[in-house]
């Protein structure tokens, strides 16, 4: 299934990757790789991850304290937010 992104997702990812880049370039690459793999898993099987709110699903990264929310459309999934687990849990739920 195709993946589309909310316009602010790129900013979310850059912000998260920058934190890891400051620690280690390799760690930033590993974060990016895990995020891409997890998004691919969601695209392959959109119902794989549990519901979050009324219209989203939440996929947690395994090695990093981040998740992304996505919604399922007939022909694609749309990633709405990439966020840290400690950020407000409803952050991004109002993105459309």
Cite the ranges covered by each PLM segment.
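Arg/Lys-rich, positively charged N-terminal/basic patches that mediate binding to nucleic acids
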Residues: 1-32
